[in-house]
Structures are given as structure tokens and as C-alpha cells.
A protein has these predicted regions:
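Short, small-residue-biased leader/transition segments that mark boundaries at the very start
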Residues: 1-5
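Metal-dependent phosphohydrolase cores
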Residues: 7-193
């Protein structure tokens, strides 16, 4: 009976974690005018493919996807998630036409880059709790920056720039900049999102 209880508690804690994360992102999305994205953010986490894996590998201090990847060599939950959520740069990886690489990143629309920044802030808050500082999302990004060759250069530059605003000037100024400057300057594209 104690194993059943432990599994139930992990499921409840995982649900609480994803609900809290979703609410943090939604609040920030609403603050910058991204209402639809705020409402729809990470809904795939409630599907059986992602939710059941999250319950099984829940630890509370990091993504269950990392634990699944360590256990079986791949995260089925992550593969499902990135394919359905446009705020992940991995969603935008496609075959390359440059002849140098097999795959490459397509440029992300700014509304999804903005959501990605809010996602990173909220994930850091969720996993770090009271230890969270506004430098954490940038520090986390910088740890892997040199390995992220498959992100489109413009997306990479914009992501780092927004994280630096958070680090140097704080969340309030970041959200103001996103709403009144960044989202108003979407580069022209022939792609329909």
C-alpha cells in the first residue's frame, strides 16, 4: 500500500508543479498581451504521453524528462512536448538547405521567443523556489550556449538579449520591453504561423 501511496503523492506533486508553472507563464503572457499563448501554454503536459511519464519520474527539483532520458536513453515525453509547443526552439528544427548541416533552426516568431523566455523564468522559479534569482535563467542558458549550434542565429541572439535584460534590469523592465518594443518589431516572413 505504501508504494501506491507514494505514486499517488508523486502524481499530485507533479500536477501541482505543472499547474504552478502554467500559471506563472500565463500571468507573464497576459502582462505582455499574449493572451492566447498564456491560456494554451504547455497544455500537452496534461496528455497521458507526458503526464504519466512526469508522474513516474517526478523529483520536484528538475524536469522529469531528464530522469526519463537517464533511465531509458530518450525522453518520450520531451519528444511529444517539443513537437506540440512552439515556444521551444527545438520545435523549429528542420532539414538544412545550406549543404553544411543536415539540420538547422528556422527563425522563431517573436511571440514564441517571448513565451520561451517566460517559460525559462517560470521553470527556474518552480525548480529553485526561494533560491531563484533573476540571473538564473541567463546562467542556465549560458551553460549550454556553445552547444546550441542548431538554433537559428537570430533566435539565439534574441533569446540571449532578453535574458540579459532580465539579468541586468529585472523582470518588470523585461516584460515592459517585450510588450512595448520587442513584440512590435516582428521581422517580415513569408511563413504563416
Amino acid at each position: 500500500a505504501s508504494d501506491v501511496y507514494k505514486r499517488q503523492m508523486k502524481a499530485l506533486e507533479h500536477l501541482r508543479t505543472i499547474n504552478h508553472h502554467k500559471m506563472l507563464v500565463m500571468k507573464q503572457c497576459f502582462q505582455v498581451g499574449l493572451y492566447k499563448q498564456g491560456l494554451l501554454h504547455d497544455l500537452s503536459k496534461y496528455t497521458p504521453t507526458e503526464f504519466l511519464v512526469g508522474c513516474k519520474y517526478y523529483q520536484g527539483t528538475r524536469s522529469p524528462n531528464n530522469a526519463e532520458r537517464e533511465d531509458i536513453g530518450v525522453s518520450t515525453s520531451w519528444l511529444h512536448h517539443k513537437g506540440r509547443n512552439k515556444h521551444h526552439f527545438e520545435h523549429w528544427v528542420d532539414y538544412s538547405l545550406d549543404g553544411e548541416h543536415v539540420i538547422m533552426g528556422a527563425p522563431m516568431p517573436r511571440k514564441y521567443v517571448a513565451e520561451m523566455v517566460m517559460d525559462r523564468i517560470s521553470a527556474s522559479r518552480n525548480y529553485l523556489g526561494d533560491a531563484y534569482t533573476e540571473s538564473q535563467p541567463l546562467e542556465y542558458y549560458l551553460k549550454s550556449k556553445d552547444s546550441l549550434w542548431f538554433i537559428h542565429p537570430r533566435t539565439k541572439k534574441e533569446l540571449e538579449g532578453l535574458l540579459r535584460i532580465l539579468n541586468d534590469h529585472g523582470e518588470k523592465k523585461l516584460l515592459h520591453y517585450i510588450k512595448y518594443v520587442y513584440l512590435k518589431q516582428e521581422p517580415k516572413s513569408r511563413i504563416k504561423y
